Amino acid sequence: MVEKDFIGSKGIKVSGTSSWEAPSNIALVKYWGKFGNQYPQNPSLSFTLSKCVSQTSVSFTERLKAGSDFSFDFSFEGKPTPSFHPKIESFFQRIDQYVPFLKDHHLSIKSKNSFPHSSGIASSASGMSALALCILSIEKEGCPDISESFFLKKASFLARLGSGSAARSVEGPLVTWGSSESFEDSSNFYGTAINSEIHSVFKNYRDTILLIDKGQKKVSSTVGHNLMNNHLYAATRFKQAHENTALLKSILASGDLDAFVSLVESEALTLHALMMASNPYFILMHPNTLEVLNKVWDYRNTNNSALCFTLDAGANVHLLYPDSESESVIKFIKEELASYCQNGQFIEDQIGNGAKKL
């Protein structure tokens, strides 16, 4: 499919409300670096989460006179939140040609997260995905012949224009985004649920998120992505990501947990090494992040465990482990790792199946 395939019909005029719940996700093979209209420089592959979700409701009413601007109001956690308006306005400008009926309507948007907004967990993926799904549901109401397959592709396509990683928050439990020889139907335009063989051990995998720092990052992901444009190691990294995507596909089929641990942790540390080797350079890990990583390594060696970590573009740590180890790992977290978390907070989550209509 190409971009023009997603250009929507003009003249759709509907009233009503659409509500969706969309999950966050955690990349195993990392997306870092973009080009053009929110296209990834390399493929990424992620676990869709189950409990860390955004719930969004959009009420559409037809405007008496369509304007050249967008008409909307936004509330978060039940309170009007004008500080979000610039980001939503920018998103609407990016998707305008694909959903040209937006300017014919006033949108009343209400959103909330299942996790604290100030937790340090990136909510843009779940939030933008949920908003895109709500908007596309309205389009489907006006164009009921839209197929389920096309609906999911276009929802991911639109979500990508709000936040790159949001492209991976429509489906589940494992999603790839970015053209890759390893997955025939992969695309730079949208995320795709992985339909190849997945070993049973990964079907109920756990992710406990240690909230090391709940504050705002000193360097945004957008800035970090842009620093890859002239990065000394960019070409090597993009090649590595393609190779790791192919390797991870094989690991997911075989259930080789030793190989999974090695690849996932290498990807996490590579992401932060790229930040430290950028110009200008920056560090998003905190001292407590490193303390946790060393504790995880010690625990794994001592207990013959498959517990491993991954990191997003921040200080928090995602601990990944098989469901069979849940009891022992949670005990370890409470006894030895919670003290490194801000206010002792962590969130227990697991692999999920993607967005759902409410």
Spans of features found by a protein language model:
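ATP-dependent small-molecule kinase catalytic core of the GHMP/sugar-kinase superfamily
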Residues: 147-301, 305-307, 324-335, 340, ...
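ATP-binding N-lobe of GHMP and related small-molecule kinases
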Residues: 1-119, 133-149, 332, 347-358
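Short beta-strand segments
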Residues: 48, 211-213, 310-312
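Short, flexible, solvent-exposed loop/turn segments with mixed acidic/basic and small polar residues
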Residues: 61-64, 305-311
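Catalytic-loop motifs flanking and including active-site residues across diverse enzymes
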Residues: 24, 127-131, 240, 244, ...
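Short Gly/Ser/Thr- and Asp/Glu-enriched loop/turn motifs at secondary-structure junctions
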Residues: 106, 310-315
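Long, hydrophobic, well-ordered secondary-structure blocks that form the structural core
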Residues: 109, 117-169, 173-176
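Short hydrophobic/aromatic beta-strand micro-patches
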Residues: 318-322
